UniProtKB/Swiss-Prot annotation:
A cellular-component GO term for this protein: cytosol
Annotated protein name in UniProt: L-ribulose-5-phosphate 4-epimerase UlaF
SMART domains on file: Aldolase_II
HAMAP family: UlaF (MF_01952)
Cofactor stoichiometry and binding remark: Binds 1 zinc ion per subunit.
Length: 228
């Protein structure tokens, strides 16, 4: 697990590097599917002092199997998503400013241009709010459940992120680094959408044919963007 712990540590350290977190407001995890184990950031440990050895390993029930610290308080959310979506290899949660603003407003981040379409096939959805019973019960688990309720059976890697109403963004990817990459993009397109709608409140969504072209040339079966 040392290699995965190093990967998760590096991905967590990318959060402050890319301006996605303030203090300890974020976490990254990755899963070893063969072993059924997840590596995640320890709860409340400052990035300035954190080391790869501090990463916490949990099983799919959330039991700590390796590590001196308690795992992130959002661990149950991560585990619920891993259980539901086998294509996920890494998950990120932050409170990045612009994506969180859309979450607090209770609005999906609209797909307005090609930057968005290069990564997200459609709007980045916003979940419903959790009920008082859901919050007072198993809050973090229920956060995962409301994300799954919103995504349904859609391929999560086609829309690799979501904003949880009144909470903040979650992003995911093939591994921890890919998840962070998608979290960075989500924050950028959230900012772009806010600015664009401020300039033109009547702005429509990107044309579907342009969205299809940009997404499929990077992610479709005949993708040709980048190098092989």
């Amino acid at each position: 697990m040392q290699k995965l712990k190093q990967q998760v540590f590096e991905a967590n350290m990318d959060l402050p590097r890319y301006g996605l977190v303030t203090f300890t407001w974020g976490n990254v995890s990755a899963i070893d599917r063969e072993r059924g184990l997840v590596v995640i950031k320890p709860s409340g440990v400052a990035y300035e002092t954190m080391k790869a050895a501090d990463m916490v390993v949990v099983d799919m029930s959330g039991k700590v199997v390796e590590g001196e610290y308690r795992p992130s308080s959002d661990t149950a959310t991560h585990l619920e998503l891993y259980r539901r979506y086998p294509s996920l290899g890494g998950i990120v949660h932050t409170h990045s400013t612009h994506a969180t603003a859309w979450a607090q407003a209770g609005l999906a981040i609209p797909a307005l241009g090609t930057t968005h379409a290069d990564y997200f096939f459609g709007d980045i959805p916003c979940t419903r709010g959790l009920s008082e019973e859901e919050v007072q019960g198993e809050y973090e688990l229920n956060t995962g459940k409301v994300i799954i309720e919103t995504l349904g059976d859609a391929e999560p890697l086609h829309t690799p992120g979501i904003v949880v109403y009144q909470h903040g963004p979650f992003a995911w990817g093939k591994d921890a680094h890919d998840a962070v990459h998608n979290a960075v993009v989500m924050e950028e397109v959230a900012k772009m959408a806010w600015i664009a709608r401020s300039i033109n409140p009547q702005l429509n969504h990107i044309d579907s044919y342009l969205m299809n072209k940009h997404f499929m040339r990077k992610h479709g079966p005949n993708a040709y963007y980048g190098q092989k």
